[in-house]
Amino acid sequence: MKPSRLSSLDPVKMPEWRWAPFLSHAINAFIPLKPEPYPVAPEFLQREGKTGSKSQPIRVTTCTWACRTKKFRQVRAACVEAGRSASVLNFVINPYHTFDLPFFGADLVTLPSGHLLALDLQPAITSDERHTKQVWERLMPIFEHWRVHLPEGGPIPEEAKPYFSPGFLWTRLPLSIEGNQLIDEVIMPAFKDYLNLYLDLVEMAEEVSPQRAFKLLEGQKRYLSYRAKKDPARAMLARFHGHQWTESYIHNVLFDL
């Protein structure tokens, strides 16, 4: 059978996938940046699996959309559709370490227990004001504008705090008409605002000195190492596609620096 996706830039086509409008908006926003395919092994471009019971199996599709640009080392979207079991968009922008930029992160997850939704511009070096000040000054008004419309998602583990900004927008919503309305009326415009700010920061960013670039690279490596070690999707992906595939996907695609 011919693979349905041959390039990381090929469209992600998953009927009923909840998060398609979010990825579509992001992809359109990248068009002026002239994105090129990011190298992703064929077995990770699209993977089919099953979950559920023998009598009521549920089809699982996992796709990876990815690109790179002049200032982005890797932009990647991990997309999962598993019917009533899960619907996921994990979207991360990894800038080149030669630019003093944070990561962009969006984690949009639907599980049987509800929606878990998070947006952030995540710092590579939290303690470095040169790295964070200009970002947080512009991010916090956006965060404050949208946070009042959403319930709190809960506390952040102490060990994770260095990897998030004060503008970490994090909420849990019920599987209900009200939850869907908040996704459409709050989460989607917040996603657009966070992404617009990020792309504005990227446009203004200029290359840094080799010494500064080395410091940023070390910060990026710490962040990605932590994310790979603590990836909350690990158990779900292993259940859908097996342990070996999942570990390779996490370390060689999602957090590959």
UniProtKB/Swiss-Prot annotation:
GO molecular function: any one?
A: cobalt ion binding
Q: What Gene Ontology terms for biological process does this UniProt record contain? A: phytochromobilin biosynthetic process
EC number(s) in its UniProt entry? 1.3.7.3
Arranged from A to Z, the UniProt key words for this protein are: Oxidoreductase
The answer on whether this UniProt entry bears the keyword Cell wall biogenesis/degradation reads: no
- Kindly state which reaction or reactions the protein catalyses: (3Z)-phycoerythrobilin + oxidized 2[4Fe-4S]-[ferredoxin] = 15,16-dihydrobiliverdin + reduced 2[4Fe-4S]-[ferredoxin] + 2 H(+)
- The residues forming the signal peptide are none
Q: InterPro entries, per this entry?
A: Ferredoxin-dep_bilin_Rdtase, Phycoerythrobilin_Fdx_Rdtase
Q: Identify the enzyme class.
A: oxidoreductase
Q: Gene3D superfamilies per the record?
A: 3.40.1500.20
Q: Which PANTHER family match?
A: PHYTOCHROMOBILIN:FERREDOXIN OXIDOREDUCTASE, CHLOROPLASTIC
Similarity-based family: Belongs to the HY2 family.
Under NCBIfam families, the record lists: PRK13249.1
Function, as annotated, reads: Catalyzes the two-electron reduction of the C2 and C3(1) diene system of 15,16-dihydrobiliverdin.
Name of the featured protein: Phycoerythrobilin:ferredoxin oxidoreductase
Organism of derivation: Prochlorococcus marinus (strain MIT 9313)
> What is the primary gene name for this protein?
pebB
